[in-house]
Amino acid sequence: FWTVKVWTNKSKRSSQSKVSSWKTGLMDKQNWKSNWITVNNEDMTSPKIPYFINDFRVDSKIISANLYITSRGVYEAHINGKRIGDAILTPGWTSYSNRIQYQAYDVMEMLLTGENRIGVMLADGWYRNFRQNRKNRIVDYGERTSFISELIISYEDGRKESIIDEKNWSYNYGPILSSSIYNGERVDMNLKNSKWSFPGHKNKNSKKAKIASRYKGFIDYTRNEMIKKREVLSAKELIITPSGDKVIDFGQNLVGWVKF
């Protein structure tokens, strides 16, 4: 806990600030008690995006709940049907062989009394890539994507619980048939399942997840600004080239995606 009071060089002083506090994250990979989670061997090379789920119960009053998560690949995490955070392409691009960044989220308000579900979507990101213009897959950092997460819950009665049960993770596939940093996504909306991360929802064709190899590099908390949606730009001009191709001009350089 900390509080602040300021004195000037003219002996004037401010009022005392309100008491505040901070939380210490997982300082070293040895602090992570959970295992890395991945798909089973037969799905290892599939370009489809797996949707992982883990069900757990909360039966006492909570005073805090924090999710710590990172991945070899990029992830999007959900709890009880709601997306966690607003960052995109987490955990970001680092030299995965040496260092991976993790993120921490306050998820106390997302938890329910009784049954709960945490869900994780996992894509290749910068970690590995399927290049559509070649027959063979090019591996950038590794052949198998995976994630690690730890949900730490503190209860009013003084107990602390870590949701790390790797045996309870399962996965199936959804509408995203492939996802690439360089080649975009292929999506079949006929396969969309908007309730996949709802507690109690039965996902069809679920498979038991597998424990992945441990990460040998350094796991560090995010040091940089996260990638987020900043603004929406309207198209300025539709250009038709001599060959008949249509080019949409937004009037400036940008990094983002197109919505029709």
Model regions: which residues?
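Accessory beta-strand-rich segments of carbohydrate-active enzymes
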Residues: 1-3, 8-10, 21-28, 42, ...
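Short, exposed coil/turn segments at beta-strand boundaries within extracellular/luminal domains
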Residues: 11-16
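Predominantly extracellular/luminal regions of secreted and cell-surface proteins
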Residues: 22-33, 198-225
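Short, solvent-exposed loop/edge segments of extracellular or virion-exposed proteins
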Residues: 35-43
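Edge strands and adjacent loops of beta-rich recognition modules
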Residues: 44-49, 209-250
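Tight coil/turn sites that cap or link beta-strands
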Residues: 61, 114, 241-244, 251-253
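CBM-like, beta-strand-rich accessory domains located in the C-terminal region of large
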Residues: 178-203, 207, 212
